[in-house]
Swiss-Prot record:
Name of the protein in its database record: Uncharacterized protein AF_1823
Subcellular location: Cell membrane
Organism the protein comes from: Archaeoglobus fulgidus (strain ATCC 49558 / DSM 4304 / JCM 9628 / NBRC 100126 / VC-16)
Annotated keywords: Cell membrane, Membrane, Transmembrane, Transmembrane helix
Membrane spanning stretches: 5-24, 29-48, 53-75, 87-109, 124-146
Main localization category: membrane
GO terms under cellular component: plasma membrane
């Protein structure tokens, strides 16, 4: 397993873990935050394959616009949990997850090849200011959403 495969696999695992966090959390605010983190990891997977337009679209639209609107709405609307999760759903979910994991493990026979192997060093140099700007923009928008929701001064 080469470093490219490892980076993509780790980003995929974190994306799956944070998407499970969206399903398991009972608070809309944290579900929106988990959704934004999930989309950032999906964008990281596309960045590993050197597909920059998709990364920019995911970062700007999904994380930026949709994530901030969802965070703002979820932070202002705090309702009680209307549904309970039945414990009997745990076993079928684990069985389906095990079947999917086994199918994926049996079909993954080769390493993932990246078209441009210098992509990871290029992201650090060529797109540093773009990534820093997008990260700063997302943090500022989330802070303003929290400020509006809680009506406090930061």
């Amino acid at each position: 397993m080469n470093i490219d495969t490892l980076i993509i696999a780790v980003a995929g695992l974190f994306a799956v873990a944070s998407s499970i966090g969206v399903l398991l959390t009972k608070d809309n605010f944290y579900a929106a935050l988990y959704m934004s983190v999930t989309m950032l990891f999906v964008a990281a997977i596309y960045a590993a394959f050197n597909i920059q337009p998709v990364v920019v679209i995911i970062a700007l639209i999904f994380v930026g616009a949709v994530g901030i609107v969802t965070v703002a709405i979820a932070a202002t609307y705090r309702a009680g949990v209307s549904r309970k999760v039945n414990i009997f759903w745990v076993v079928p979910v684990i069985v389906v997850f095990a079947i999917l994991a086994l199918a994926y493990a049996s079909m993954a026979v080769e390493s993932i090849e990246v078209v441009n192997p210098e992509v990871f060093s290029a992201v650090a140099t060529d797109y540093f200011f773009v990534v820093a700007f997008l990260f700063t923009l997302v943090v500022l928008m989330m802070l303003s959403a929290i400020k509006l929701a809680r009506r406090v001064d930061l």
